[in-house]
Amino acid sequence: MAITDTEFHQLADDMFQAIENAIETAIDEQDADVDIDASGNVLQLEFVDGSKIVINKQEPLHEIWVATRFGGYHFGFVEGKWMDGRNGGEFMPFVQESIERQGGIKLSF
């Protein structure tokens, strides 16, 4: 079943907030060095080496797009989960792994 624009934004905003909270915890507990910039439909993480992970909402498609230094990924809401259309991976574990791989920061959700 398709989700409405309102549902899409609520689900995406909840995920963005969970990521921000986990990063803030990592900064406090691990002395992680990462900058968070949340602006509109975009959440951008910049690591000490200058690399970035950009997560953005694609409202017309009801997708979340993620760009890492390893590639770009598109996640759609399928059966209650955000899933990658190419490889079937789930969004939050993917983001957790990407942040650890790219920035060396272990997140807990």
Swiss-Prot record:
UniProt xrefs under Pfam families: Frataxin_Cyay (PF01491)
SMART domains: Frataxin_Cyay
Biological process, per Gene Ontology: iron-sulfur cluster assembly
Domain of life where this protein originates: Bacteria
Keywords, comma-separated and alphabetical: Iron, Metal-binding
One GO cellular component term noted in the UniProt record for this chain: cytosol
InterPro entries: CyaY (IPR047584), Frataxin/CyaY (IPR002908), Frataxin/CyaY_sf (IPR036524), Frataxin_CS (IPR020895)
GO molecular function terms noted in the UniProt entry: ferric iron binding; ferrous iron binding
Signal sequence residues: none
NCBIfam families in the cross-refs: FeS_CyaY (TIGR03421)
Biological role: Involved in iron-sulfur (Fe-S) cluster assembly. May act as a regulator of Fe-S biogenesis.
Family that this chain belongs to: Belongs to the frataxin family.
Name of the protein: Iron-sulfur cluster assembly protein CyaY
